[in-house]
Amino acid sequence: MAENKYIVGSRDDSDFTTWTAAELAEKIHAREISSQEVTQAHLDRIGEIDGDIHAFLHVGADEALAAASNVDDALAAGDQPTSKLAGVPLALKDVFTTTDAPTTCASKMLEGYMSPYDATVTMRLRAAGIPILGKTNMDEFAMGSSTENSAYGATKNPYDLERTPGGSGGGSSAALAAGMAPLAIGTDTGGSIRQPAALTNTVGVKPTYGTVSRYGLVACASSLDQGGPTARTVLDTALLHEVIAGHDANDSTSSSHAVAPVVEAAKQGASGDLSGVKLGVVKQFEKAEAFQPGVLETYHANLEQLKSQGAELVEVDCPNFDHALNAYYLILPCEVSSNLARFDGMRYGQRRGDDGTRSADQVMSLTRAEGFGPEVKRRIMLGTYALSVGYYDAYYLQAQRVRNLISQDFAKAYEQVDAIVAPVTPSTAFKLGEKVDDPLAMYMFDLFTLPLNLAGVCGMSVPGGFASDSGLPTGLQIMGPAHGDDRLYRVGAAFEAGRS
């Protein structure tokens, strides 16, 4: 098979795009290489291949190199690194506000919009000395599972340019897989970090709800959205998790709970030993109808590997998971219809038809009609209907009751096990255009990831190998209890070590 030029190559001392973030940080901090060299190497890689992949919506070369220069100058002056990742560049999903780059959420509604403030995640990255290479492509307002809902064109999977990298954060994961960035930030509302990670052979973590600030994260569904770290190794992901997590007074849903010791856990897991660890296998997931045979085969091989590493597998019964998809796709549109009401053409973003002949209502209507894409409109309509008089109790409140039962299922499971393992997706990456006209088929792709968001607990996707029938990447999902994020990293790092 011919070598795929779009996939990051094997480790090469002369090519910084093949190094892990931990390796880059060590050498930058020892002043054996410079952050500017590393950042430029990744900018060159973006220039070389992103025209074909379209992972980035905006590249900020000057800003990234200036940030890298600041790190190099501080180290040369004898200062200590401002974080364990200082000098290592990163790709940021275009749903976090930035003062020096547009924040579009991949929507025409926010085309060219410049935020007057940085998101807390953005501020923490800057304070940590991490150069931001640019803003990555996504499904519009984080609504979708393929990045095809972007108003600026789909991102392509580096493993097969005819296929999706997943969504909504396909741009961040594609950038990692292609060696355009060693680190990236995503958001996960129903699987938007974990699902692209699985389809691109990368690592993605959805932290416990409330542990990464949502201040400056443009809201899709406020009770479900959570920013999180992505990278190519479990340790790199843990190092980034440590940078962005922690209480934030600007976010009313921010948790004051101490950040879990994720880096320590990743290092502990690197031994590969899982003796004494109990892992739950969800009974309901085994009977999913939409499984691609190669994905199920790889998943069962992953379970055997975990057993060989000393883990005990325990079947757990989560009966309400069968209703998670229905509950999620009621709760999410309801929150979407409320959150996106602010995009009215009056205060910020696009304004259409304001020629002096139309009323404010007409301008607002035209702005929303032209500014939002089909999937966003679909979810606004669904949510508005479900919240309307006469339907609120039957739909929204009932979905919230199911959500509570799903949380109880998780709580009961974690009384028996330390973590739960599951597939991430029912199939490997599908072809672009294959599901775009079938929203229900697209929604089914989130079957294994969204229960976790409804419960507010944490989860990871770690590379699980390649499916025998498609030759494409799969992911193993590891789920932990609230504030048990360190368990993900211990099990994930051990599984990663066992595979290598």
From Swiss-Prot:
MF GO annotations: ATP binding; glutaminyl-tRNA synthase (glutamine-hydrolyzing) activity
Entry-linked SUPFAM superfamilies: Amidase signature (AS) enzymes
InterPro entries (alphabetical): Amidase, Amidase_CS, Amidase_dom, AS_sf, GatA
Annotated coiled-coil segments of the chain: none
GO biological process entries: translation
UniProt keyword terms in alphabetical order: ATP-binding, Ligase, Nucleotide-binding, Protein biosynthesis
Domain of life according to the entry: Bacteria
Any Pfam family: Amidase
Reaction(s) this enzyme catalyzes, per UniProt: L-glutamyl-tRNA(Gln) + L-glutamine + ATP + H2O = L-glutaminyl-tRNA(Gln) + L-glutamate + ADP + phosphate + H(+)
Primary enzyme class: ligase
EC number annotated for this UniProt entry: 6.3.5.7
Active-site residues from the entry: 93, 168, 192
PROSITE patterns given in the database record: AMIDASES
GO cellular component: glutamyl-tRNA(Gln) amidotransferase complex
UniProt cross-references to NCBIfam families, sorted A to Z: gatA
Function: Allows the formation of correctly charged Gln-tRNA(Gln) through the transamidation of misacylated Glu-tRNA(Gln) in organisms which lack glutaminyl-tRNA synthetase. The reaction takes place in the presence of glutamine and ATP through an activated gamma-phospho-Glu-tRNA(Gln).
Family: Belongs to the amidase family. GatA subfamily.
Self-association state and partner proteins as the record states: Heterotrimer of A, B and C subunits.
Protein name: Glutamyl-tRNA(Gln) amidotransferase subunit A
Encoding gene per record: gatA
